[in-house]
Amino acid sequence: MSRIGKLPVSITKGVKVELKDDKVIVSGPKGTLEQKLRPEVTVSVDGNNVVVTRKDDTRPSKEMHGLYRVLINNMVTGVSTGFTKKLELVGVGYKAEIKKDMLVLSLGFSHQIYFKTPAEIKVEVPAPTNISISGSDKELVGQVAAKIRSFRPPEPYQGKGVKYENEVIRRKEGKAAGK
């Protein structure tokens, strides 16, 4: 990971990076994110770049070096442009809608699923079979999308379920009829 770690993170316009104690705080038009740092890495702001350096050349230090560089890069991208994941509902009668602050899913069960999203995440339903999840925290956007997908993951025989927008479902052949 050190090849990634040695690249500086460029700070886009409108984004502010602060270093406090053992935390990196990135704020921008889409919000504020903070990341606690491990002792293996040090972070410095050099003009319009954030530079991540490691203390020594041990394997854990090299791993943390690349990891924290990518985490800070994702924070800068998140507060400036944000992240979006899109889900599709495939199946007869599968639909989603938003009621108040809850996402209501009808996924072929005998009951509807009510999902309360975190305050930092924006969930939109442009069509009854499409869900768009957006926010500034890449990890949280991915977690919410994975949680919604876990209610009815796509099955390999007919492809029904909740899937990511460009996800390819490996299909299986059904039972072959005997004589």
From Swiss-Prot:
Any Pfam family the entry gives: Ribosomal_L6
GO MF, one example: rRNA binding
Assigned keywords, A-Z: Ribonucleoprotein, Ribosomal protein, RNA-binding, rRNA-binding
GO BP field: cytoplasmic translation
InterPro entries: Ribosomal_uL6-like (IPR000702), Ribosomal_uL6-like_a/b-dom_sf (IPR036789), Ribosomal_uL6_a/b-dom (IPR020040), Ribosomal_uL6_bac-type (IPR019906)
One Gene Ontology cellular component: cytosolic large ribosomal subunit
Main function: This protein binds to the 23S rRNA, and is important in its secondary structure. It is located near the subunit interface in the base of the L7/L12 stalk, and near the tRNA binding site of the peptidyltransferase center.
Subunit comment: Part of the 50S ribosomal subunit.
Family statement drawn from the similarity comment of this UniProt entry: Belongs to the universal ribosomal protein uL6 family.
Protein's name according to its UniProt entry: Large ribosomal subunit protein uL6
